[in-house]
């Protein structure tokens, strides 16, 4: 089996990307009283979301974190869309949202999440900030802030904690 070379994110690299994200994101309008972090894909994004929510704290108050499960590439998104819709009350009590994801490969999860937030929850795009540590240059939805880009056609992104996952196609 031939695999693409890895774009491997070590624990040290993850920390570097988190710190870079803290630095590049304009957090001047983030206020814990009206802004929340949406932790997309908690199994991958818990670490970065937690660090950023605390880094963007004001007067000793960290941003709230709301976990949202997302699809793997081989899953239908409808279940996850319905599940996010069930979080309406938790999410809409905030005026601004920062969606945080460890890695954006295709952009499909950003796409349906933005659709739910804008069409169902009535958020304006200007009140939603998309942040990722790593993004494929060919993602169909582009994040507002990216700590590092890679090319998924040439490399396979992998984090140090990942093991075999039946949902990820090997190509």
Task: List PLM regions with ranges.
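Short, glycine/charge-rich flexible loops or terminal/linker lids adjacent to PRPP-binding catalytic cores
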Residues: 54-97, 105-115
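Active-site-facing substrate-recognition patch
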Residues: 1-32
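A structural signal for isolated positions on well-ordered beta-strands in alpha/beta enzyme cores
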Residues: 37, 66, 98, 129-132
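A short acidic (Asp/Glu
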Residues: 47-52, 109-112, 141
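PRPP-dependent phosphoribosyltransferase catalytic core
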Residues: 3-8, 31, 115-171
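Short glycine-rich phosphate-binding loop at a beta-alpha junction
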Residues: 31-44
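A general structural motif
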Residues: 32-35, 62, 92-96, 125-127
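Glycine-rich helix-loop-beta junction characteristic of Rossmann-like nucleotide cofactor-binding loops
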Residues: 25-32, 88-92, 121
């Amino acid at each position: 089996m031939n695999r693409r070379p890895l774009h491997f994110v070590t624990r040290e690299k993850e920390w570097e990307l988190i710190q870079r994200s803290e630095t590049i994101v304009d957090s001047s309008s983030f206020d814990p009283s009206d802004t929340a972090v949406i932790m997309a894909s908690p199994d991958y994004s818990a670490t970065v979301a937690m660090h950023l929510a605390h880094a963007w704290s004001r007067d000793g108050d960290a941003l709230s974190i709301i976990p949202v499960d997302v699809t793997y590439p081989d899953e239908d998104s409808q279940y996850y869309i319905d599940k996010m819709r069930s979080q309406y009350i938790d999410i809409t009590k905030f005026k601004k949202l920062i969606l945080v994801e460890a890695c954006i490969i295709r952009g499909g999860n950003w796409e349906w999440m933005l659709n739910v937030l804008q069409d169902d929850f009535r958020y304006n795009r200007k009140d939603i900030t998309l942040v990722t540590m790593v993004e494929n240059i060919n993602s169909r939805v582009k994040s507002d802030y990216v700590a590092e880009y890679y090319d998924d056609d040439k490399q396979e992104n992998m984090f140090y904690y990942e093991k075999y996952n039946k949902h990820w196609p090997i190509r």
